[in-house]
Every structure is written in structure tokens, then in C-alpha cells.
């Protein structure tokens, strides 16, 4: 797996955990960034929005 793919998966893992813990509405992109010590640019390189992350988390869970 490429470094970018690993970063994308890490964002999804972190977001999924925060969505479960706090709920989607109560989780901000900044919360995800803070939990990962990730820059906004690093986040937006992989996802265009928090909704895009939710869609990717949902798709990944549907594949399991």
C-alpha cells in the first residue's frame, strides 16, 4: 500500500472513531486534524469535505 493510501486509511480510521464517539454533527474537520496532528492541506488532499469522509467511511464499512 502506498504512503498516500495509508494516510487516507488513517484519516478514515480516525474519523470513524470520532464519529462513533461524538457523532457526525459534533465532529469537525479540525477535530480529525487535531487527533492526527495533520495539516488542513493533508486532509483536503485526500477528501474535499467532512461529508466526503463520511461517505468513504460508510462505503468502507459496507464492504466489510
Regions of interest found by a model, annotated:
Residues 3-5, 24-25:
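Short, flexible segments with low predicted structural confidence
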Residues 25, 44, 63:
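Nucleotide phosphate-binding site architecture
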Residues 18-27, 47:
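Short helix/strand-capping hinge loops at secondary-structure junctions
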Residues 30:
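Residues within the helices of the helix-turn-helix
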